[in-house]
Amino acid sequence: MKSFLLAAALASVSAPAPAVAPEAAWRADIADTNKAYTVTPHAILKIQDAAYLGEGNVASLMGQRGVPGSYKWVQGYQPGAALVAAFSGGKAALKKEDKPLANSLADIEVDKDVDVQAYPTQVQAGVPGIRVFVYNQQNPATKAFKGVDYFPYNPAFIVTADFTPDPNLPPRSFITSRRTSKQFYHAGVAHFILQGKQFDLPFYADTNDPKKITSLSAFFTDDLTGKGAYGAGRYVDAPDLKSFPPKQFKIDFNYAYNPNCARSAFFTCPVAVDHMALAVFVGERDPHLHH
């Protein structure tokens, strides 16, 4: 479940392409990821602040006109705010200069090089709310970014897994990087052999409606976690499912990636709890050790 924000950021740069060799496709995916971190208008590292709002919560965006780096959220209603965001009656409600906006989930320009976007989210497991990001097109974090860092590509870490679905798709709550909780649905278990070892790895969906499940994700740690791989674990996806449940699907650990929280404090990412007793020397490295 590579972050929908990453997917949204890539929307402006990605286009259908002819089939390419697996390693070339992997390198292209890394290039797109780098763009999603720094280049696109809603790049991840352009986020300057975030407000997470549940039912009845209000936040005010305060800042100095003409100074993009000054815009920050303040809890509650503040007179003179550039923008006021609230979540009420299960819906986002945003006001600019005290005037309600017709579409509170649209991109909102606040100042030169500063815009705001609200997204549906969970403020606790299964509890709806919104997260409202402030984007600064001149954010210094984009200049400091050196690109994502991956272990070398190795086709030996591509497996075909048999899948045992969980017919009930029960909810499972994960502790997040912000010490809140976030709910996903246990879709089933993937069974595969990797480096001569048998693994049974749980996969999760973001909906419990089988007709809407088009991809699955595993949140895993391995023997490299904290020793070259990100300490909160990595994610790997089974994308582009034709239907659910599949009998089998491919897992390519070369694409194992860090949650957005590895580089941005403004996200709430589930902390992995499913362990693989193997050093997975592919996928993304820990950015704090290598950059």
What do these predicted regions represent?
Residues 183-230:
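Mid-length scaffold segments of soluble, non-membrane domains
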Residues 12-16:
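N-terminal signal peptide c-region/cleavage motif recognized by signal peptidases
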